[in-house]
């Protein structure tokens, strides 16, 4: 019997519309999407999704929430249910138990374990994930953590993550070098780019500290920050105190992929001292290597796209001298090596961090009953 999928998720983030559309085109799948979560996030227009059926109202109780109208979906003629894999969603616990009784398949699309869970959270997660038939986990790292906790590896699949793969590939084919940085900075120094919200937890001052150290070593760089300051971090003030304000460009937020492509392609390296998330996919899609910290328990799954010496580097978390050394290693590459790095970046995206890869994983999950 051909699988009939029911996809229940807490919200429809803007970046997931392309993968949801592809799922809708490839499988018989209906989508039930939550109306809001407690953190501000940009959503897509649900009516644009071919398989969209209904918006579910999320009722929050502190960190926990209940999706009104989700339980009745178990009584419909779906064969498989794809859930977020969030233990905080109380209604999903009931759906899992009910589906178990009705002999229906359940699939988690989840971060799984980070490896730094408290004793209580560890127990709750173990019980919760054991209720699923299959687990689609964002990273191999999380799968390895779950294996160590007794989860059956045959029931786990690495789903990775993606952006609008076809769109980004089309932009990539038109990429070329430009002089936007030399025009802005009035020099030809290597450029470090950070792209994302400017928050205190991102520890962006470490980039300024590294730039100052490199300046003192007679290896000056420019730094561009692409994103909105949502935490009053005030990087310009910090850069001025370090005496390198003329080498810092506060670009502001940018959501246009073709503009981001030019910024990434012409930069030397993307640095994220905090965790690295979807920015990694954006950077590598446009040929820019990445540097981030090496504490994987505090990382987002996209850190796995970094292959040391090929698509970027990891530095010792909190060690600014090591971050500086890693930046220096990348910016010291000659043009031939820089071009090889671009090709490695493209190769990594084409291999795993794209929609086609995710669709193939979902096919395997549905085939291996």
Feature-to-residue mapping (PLM):
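A short, histidine- and acid-enriched strand-loop-helix "catalytic/donor-clamping" loop
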Residues: 104-123, 131-134
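Acidic donor-binding loop of glycosyltransferase active sites
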Residues: 262-275, 288-289
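Nucleotide-activated donor-binding/catalytic signature segment of Leloir-type glycosyltransferases, i.e.
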Residues: 2, 226, 233-254
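Short hydrophobic beta-strand element within catalytic cores of glycosyltransferases
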Residues: 289-298
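A charged, aromatic-enriched C-terminal amphipathic alpha-helix characteristic of glycosyltransferases
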Residues: 332-366
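Donor nucleotide-sugar binding/catalytic pocket of nucleotide-sugar-dependent glycosyltransferases
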Residues: 132-179, 187, 194
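Conserved donor-binding/catalytic core segment of Leloir-type glycosyltransferases
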Residues: 6, 181-202, 208-211
